[in-house]
Regions:
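DNA breakage-rejoining catalytic core of tyrosine-based enzymes
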Residues: 45, 84-90, 98-119, 167-188, ...
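Basic, Lys/Arg- and aromatic-enriched nucleic-acid-binding interface segment
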Residues: 67-70, 83-146, 154, 236
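Short, polar N-cap/turn motifs at the start of nucleic acid-interacting alpha helices
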Residues: 150-157, 229, 248-268
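C-terminal secondary-structure termini that scaffold catalytic or DNA-interacting sites
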Residues: 155, 166-184, 189-191, 264-267, ...
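N-terminal core-binding DNA-recognition domain of tyrosine site-specific recombinases/integrases
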Residues: 3-86, 103, 206-213, 228-234
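Active-site/catalytic core of tyrosine-dependent DNA strand-transfer enzymes
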Residues: 111-112, 163-166, 186-228
Length: 290
């Protein structure tokens, strides 16, 4: 069996039946398709980590993130092949090191820009969803998936339980990616009153719209208020950045964002806390000896 044949078999028998998120399935499909012909035609039992590393190094020179995802596909598919006795290759950090990828720094709004954004987007149909992305740090799919049943008026809480994604030709509610993404957020009274005033949809969604229309409303606000090209996901980064800068504890921010680990939150946003150079002044102020 050639490597390309095994990858197609693995995709059909192990990826598709697993009911993964559509984006994850698409990622595996792209990675399988990306395997070059010279590598795919090699016999599975004869493929070595050296050949795989040679390919990943080539990919990483152009697109490091794609190389990372290609490695994930290879690692998981060949792990299954090894369990089935189809190959004996050892895939680990030594034989097939994870390609390094430093993501571009996300563009975010300043406090003043965020205010202008809210004023500009207030007249658009997706206003409430975009406001929740900015104030609560919701992901776009999470905002689109919000239903009236997710809102507890008495407790003033919003519970994130699903995300809305395109599946085939329609939009469907899908499970969140991780347990940590399930979370309840305490909303300010003003925001809760705004949600209560929202017209109730027949479908049960807080706002029944699409990612395309939501993006259209977002771009309208960006252009009309002459703001930097922050993305919808950048609204989430803005919330986290402003919260960290205001002194919000990282553990609390992790919970609010639905991150699976504290380290992920700290790596992304710790730099927005007060710089180490400010420590002496804070200690001196705390002593208040003069």
């Amino acid at each position: 069996m050639r490597l390309s044949q095994w990858l197609e078999t693995w995709f059909s028998l192990y990826v598709l039946p697993a009911k993964l998120a559509p984006s994850t399935v698409a990622m595996y499909r792209r990675a399988v398709n990306a395997v070059p012909k010279w590598l795919g035609e090699m016999e599975l039992a004869q493929v070595t980590a050296l050949e795989l590393q040679r390919w990943l190094v080539q990919v990483a020179r152009q697109t490091p993130r794609a190389a990372q995802l290609d490695r994930v596909m290879l690692s998981r598919s060949l792990h299954v092949a090894g369990k089935l006795g189809l190959c004996s290759m050892v895939i680990d950090q030594d034989t097939l090191p994870k390609p390094q990828h430093v993501p571009d720094k996300a563009l975010v709004f300043t406090q003043a820009e965020a205010r202008r954004y809210v004023e500009a987007v207030a007249i658009r149909p997706s206003y409430v969803l975009l406001l929740l992305c900015l104030v609560c740090g919701l992901r776009r799919g999470e905002a689109l998936g919000l239903r009236w049943s997710d809102i507890d008026v008495e407790a003033s809480t919003l519970t994130i339980t699903h995300q809305r994604q395109r599946v085939g030709g329609s939009y469907q509610l899908r499970p969140l990616k991780s347990t940590a993404a399930h979370r309840s957020l305490l909303l300010p009274p003003e925001l809760m009153r705004l949600l209560q005033a929202q017209h109730r949809t027949m479908t049960g969604y807080l706002v029944d719209t699409t990612p395309e229309l939501m993006r259209k409303d977002h771009l309208f606000a960006i252009r009309s208020a002459h703001l930097p090209p922050v993305t919808i996901h950048g609204l989430r980064h803005t919330m986290a950045t402003l919260s960290a800068g205001a002194g919000c504890p990282m553990k609390l921010l992790q919970s609010a964002l639905g991150h699976s680990t504290y380290q992920l939150t700290a790596d992304l946003y710790a730099a927005h806390l007060l710089p180490p150079s400010a420590a002496p002044a804070l200690v001196w102020q705390g002593l208040a000896v003069i």
